[in-house]
Amino acid sequence: VQMADGRLAETPLRGALWQALEVDSPQALKALVVQPHFGAAGFARLAPLVDQRAQMGDPHAAAVLQRSGEALAGMVHTVAGQLDLAAPAVCAVGGAVLHLGGLRDCFERALMQRCPGARLQRPAGDACAGALHLAAQTPLRC
């Protein structure tokens, strides 16, 4: 959208994104992204394309991944601070962090800067398994 309205310079990334979204003008892009059905999922489906372009050396795509990694690390930093966790183990369960190497690498680098000692780890199970594990550790109250 920033390229469409002139806030950012035109780049090959814009063309790739517009092709993926099947739009051919700034007006079509703006109309698409405000549709109720587009939402966060509409932007999220572009993540693999941005990750791929970044790994091909596109500096604009790399900047998007860097900002995204920093934003994720900032959220971890805030939560860890509120919970007084010095070096938390972080289980990223969203598809983008699990499946997009460029994003995961940016997140991990930013995490090391914002939360020294924190580490990414694969979850041992899903949310239900975690809830059952916590329930098993909690004494029964009658």
Which residues fall in each region the model found?
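ATP-binding/phosphotransfer module of carbohydrate and carboxylate kinases, centering on a glycine-rich
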Residues: 2-142
